[in-house]
Amino acid sequence: MKKPFYITTPIYYPSGKLHIGSAYTTIACDVLARYKRLMGHEVFYLTGLDEHGQKIQTKAKEAGITPQTYVDNMAKDVKALWQLLDISYDTFIRTTDDYHEEVVAAVFEKLLAQDDIYLGEYSGWYSVSDEEFFTESQLKEVFRDEDGQVIGGIAPSGHEVEWVSEESYFLRLSKYADRLVAFFKERPDFIQPDGRMNEMVKNFIEPGLEDLAVSRTTFTWGVPVPSDPKHVVYVWIDALLNYATALGYGQANHANFDKFWNGTVFHMVGKDILRFHSIYWPILLMMLDLPMPDRLIAHGWFVMKDGKMSKSKGNVVYPEMLVERFGLDPLRYYLMRSLPVGSDGTFTPEDYVGRINYELANDLGNLLNRTVAMINKYFDGTVPAYVDNGTAFDADLSQLIDAQLADYHKHMEAVDYPRALEAVWTIIARTNKYIDETAPWVLAKEDGDKAQLASVMAHLAASLRVVAHVIQPFMMETSAAIMAQLGLAPVSDLSTLALADFPANTKVVAKGTPIFPRLDMEAEIDYIKAQMGDSSAISQEKEWVPEEVALKSEKDVITFETFDAVEIRVAEVKEVSKVEGSEKLLRFRVDAGDGQDRQILSGIAKCYPNEQELVGKKLQIVANLKPRKMMKQYISQGMILSAEHGDQLTVLTVDPSVPNGSIIG
């Protein structure tokens, strides 16, 4: 019997309308939940809202309503969005739910009694929007008065901060720092993608893990501390405990908690809240003597060509405007295909419409249309019985499908959706090529080979059946439509995916309808831009016609052969430290795929005052540069490539999924 599977989104903060960033996380978890169900697991999928906090209280006051009314309205809107996106969650938790608040209060008192929470005082720069405190050195920008005193600043998120000094209860994170590091060493795959764990250790634990303020007295919209009700529980104990309370932890009926928390537990979050989930949450579980989750997946963001989404820039994309125009499945497909694991992805209207036309309409839609039409034309709509090796091309098609199915399952288990879908589209492309190779219109002629024609039709139908199965977690409507046109029931499991498993004597529909009609590219791109509010860009972009220009370079022009002599490789930073006696140099230990690490010295120290942020990054290096001795004692075995802009140097990084030692060229 397969282990129960528990998957969670973060609980979203209902301070505004959710855009495609939040939709991405929720759909990504939904895809995994559906896949695991099809693979025979009992699944519990959790999502919900974080409904407490100062920002909610302030927004409710501005709207002239109570905080409860405000979050009730937001919850209604978010549930409607998840229904539109066909999200198959099992529970939608709200931190204002009575059962959750009761457990939060009880846990707070338990930790207070065991001295994992203590009373102190906190002073620091606080961002209401981020619900987070910052030190002066962490601020993106600092405001000073005429005497040079700091009077305010900007948080890394871009929100303003204010000075806050108040009594607060603290969670003893520092007490558990060594135990957390030991856990990370025992479970190096706990945080995905690779490299993110090193960031957390180097940036937050090694410099000294500070205790965390977990109560506030300057607002009232939260869970009161039972033994000291002028305090309300502040954000992270309240928010993080939802993953346990939703299953029944701390309640009379805890059967789901016993089942699913002892199964396989996956959390998926955006990279901006990784610290809270990778440090605060495991330590909280240690304090409560509860088992650790199996995996914490921190994904990147969808950004625009001109940076992060912003209403003022006219570049915000809401899921509703895409679903209402193009349907649900194109959105789910686009989001899951377009965001590389561990990296950010760029949304453009051109790419969105292009993927619908080229990948969904052309590749998949045309394959289905041609197959159904030919089976009707040549065999009166009945799919011929499947036989192996009816043509010279059958074995190759079958072998490719088997190999791509193995890749698909491997990537699905790794939550690498772009590569899983790439495997599916490799099957689609190979099946389209199979039509051209076998030329059924020739086999159908009077002097043709009817047995081979029958084998071709059977292989086409069987291949489409496989495709309909493996896209089901991503595109439920499309999967059902393909199965219906093939005369089959909707997909219910992924256990029988061999070509030979196609049911005998199946009759396809008499006339198939296009599942993805081709779109007018220019009109639909203009529609998306108009919905985004970017009216200035509509129908005004002219095709770029390249002209021969005089090359501008600070150095002499070189030949391709000269450039080809330079070997640029991907290298992962394992360690980095300042070089004693030098203000400019950093000393790197990198894995460049040589079989053993190499040492490189780079003069970028002034541009990276916190050099540990580079640990885990994958950089570009010149790998075949002659080693040279530096500072009389170090041998530098390569060069780290950086982009120079003004006085600043920025190292060139690559997608974390690219293997170490990969050649760039």
Curated annotation (Swiss-Prot):
Motif 'KMSKS' region, residue numbers: 308-312
EC number from the UniProt entry: 6.1.1.10
One GO CC term, this protein: cytoplasm
Subcellular location per the Swiss-Prot or TrEMBL entry: Cytoplasm
Domain of life: Bacteria
Classification via InterPro entries: Anticodon_Met, Met-tRNA-synth_bsu_C, Met-tRNA_synth, Met-tRNA_synth_2, Methionyl/Leucyl_tRNA_Synth, MetRS_core, NA-bd_OB-fold, Rossmann-like_a/b/a_fold
HAMAP family reported for this sequence: Met_tRNA_synth_type2
Subunit structure: Homodimer.
Protein name: Methionine--tRNA ligase
